Amino acid sequence: MSLPLPPALSELARALPYSRTQWLPIFVGFLIGYPILIRALRYKRHGEMKKKFYFPTRESMAEMTDEEAFLIQKEMAQLEFPFMFLTSGQFALFRTYGIPTISHLLTKTGQFSKPETSFKRYTDTAALIGEMVENSPTSQRAFISVARTRFLHSGYQASGKILDADLLYTLALFAVQPVRFIENFEWRTLSDLELCAIGTFWKSLGDALGISSEILPSGKTGFKDGIQWLEEVDVWSQDYEAKYMVPDPKNRESADQATAMLISNRYEAPTPGWSMVFSTLLAIRKLILRYLSPPRPAALAVSNIAQKPDKDDRYHRMSWDALPFYIRPTFWNRWGPMAWISWLMGHPVPGDLGQKKGPQGDPGNDEGIKDLKDGEMSLPLVWSKYHATTND
C-alpha cells in the first residue's frame, strides 16, 4: 500500500508527463542526490586549494610564504566563510574592551566611549584592518595601512600608554577568533593548510607592525611554522584573559557604544532559552550550507573595501553597520535592502549626512610613512585617499 502524496505534490505529479509511480523515484532521487552533490562541490573547492598550494607534510608548511598565506586566507574570508570571518573580527575588537588597560586608554581618548566618535573610530579601525587583510602584503595599499597603523600607535607606545602585551593580545584575537568561530559554527573545520596560513599571515603582520612575539614559549628560539605560532598565541591569549580580563567600569563605558556583550564588560549573561535558540539556528545554518547551499562563486566574493578607486581617485567601503561612513550614495546604497534596514532602525542612509559621513570623508595625510625605508616616500598615498583619521 503506497502512501498518499500531499495535494500540492499530487497536482504537480499529474502535470508532469510521467505516471505517479514513475515520478516518485525521480523526486526521491533528487532529495537524496542534491545534498550529496552540494557537499561534493563544497569540498571540491577545498581540495583544489590543497592542490594549488601544495604542502604535503607539516614540515613543508614551514616554507609557506606571506603571499601564499594571504591568498589562502583571502579565499577563506571571501568565499568559504565570509560571514564568520566578519563576525569574528567584530567580536575580536569588542573582546579587547574587557582588558582594563585597553578600555582605560580608549575612554581617555574619547574615541570609543562617546556616541559622536565611536562609530567613526570603529569604521576607521575596520578600514585599516580591511586594507591589510584584503590586499597583498607586497601591495602599496597594505604597505601604507601598516605604516599608518604604526604611526597611530607610536605616540602611545613611546609614552607607555599602550603595553606590548596588549598589542600582542589584540593581534592574537584577530588571528584566533576566526578559527574559534569557524570550528564551532561553520559547515566544516579548518585544515592544517588553512591554520598555517592564518598563523603565518598574522605573525608576519605583527612583525610589520612592530608587535613582538618574544613573550611566547618559542618567541626567542623561533617558530617552526604558522601553526605553532597560532597554537602558542591562542594559549597565551587565554591565559592573558584569565589574568587581566576583569570587571571594570571603563570596560562597559567603552563597550556601551559598540554593544559588546561580554560578561567581563559587566553585561548580564543571556538566558538559557536565548542561548538554545541561537545555538539551534547556527546548527541549522551549518547543515544548510553543507548540504543545500552551493559554494559561493568567485564572482560573488565578499569584499568590504572597493578594489578600485572612483573617478575622484578615492576608495570606499562596500557595506556599513550603523552609520554609513565612506559609503557612496548610489541608488542601490540608498534604496537597497541595507538602506531599508537602516531606515527602519532610525539610522541614516548613505548621502543623508552630506560630506561628514559621505563619499569624501576626511582628507587624510601622509603621516605614518616617514619611519619607513628611504626611497619609499614616493609611494602614492593610497590610504590617505581612503580618508582614515589620524587623530586618536
UniProtKB/Swiss-Prot annotation:
PANTHER family named in the record: ER-BOUND OXYGENASE MPAB_MPAB'_RUBBER OXYGENASE CATALYTIC DOMAIN-CONTAINING PROTEIN, PTHR36124
Pathway named in the protein's UniProt entry: Secondary metabolite biosynthesis; terpenoid biosynthesis
Region spans: Disordered: 352-376
Bias type Basic and acidic residues, positions: 367-376
Family: Belongs to the mpaB oxygenase family.
InterPro entries: MPAB
Keyword ATP-binding appears in the UniProt entry: no
Protein's name in the database: ER-bound oxygenase mpaB
Catalysed transformations (reactions): 4-farnesyl-3,5-dihydroxy-6-methylphthalide + AH2 + 2 O2 = (4E,8E)-10-(4,6-dihydroxy-7-methyl-3-oxo-1,3-dihydro-2-benzofuran-5-yl)-4,8-dimethyldeca-4,8-dienoate + acetone + A + H2O + H(+)
Ranges in the topological domain labelled Lumenal: 1-21
EC number: 1.-.-.-
Keywords for the protein's UniProt record, in alphabetical order: Endoplasmic reticulum, Membrane, Oxidoreductase, Transmembrane, Transmembrane helix
Tree of life domain: Eukaryota
Its job: ER-bound oxygenase; part of the gene cluster that mediates the biosynthesis of mycophenolic acid (MPA), the first isolated antibiotic natural product in the world obtained from a culture of Penicillium brevicompactum in 1893. MpaB catalyzes the oxidative cleavage the C19-C20 double bond in farnesyl-DHMP (FDHMP) to yield FDHMP-3C via a mycophenolic aldehyde intermediate. The first step of the pathway is the synthesis of 5-methylorsellinic acid (5MOA) by the cytosolic polyketide synthase mpaC.
The keyword Membrane is annotated on this UniProt entry: yes
Membrane topology, from the record: Single-pass membrane protein
Lineage: Eukaryota, Fungi, Dikarya, Ascomycota, Pezizomycotina
Intervals, Cytoplasmic compartment: 42-392
A Gene Ontology biological process term: mycophenolic acid biosynthetic process
Subcellular location: Endoplasmic reticulum membrane
Principal subcellular localization: endoplasmic reticulum
GO annotations of cellular component type: endoplasmic reticulum membrane
Membrane-spanning ranges: 22-41
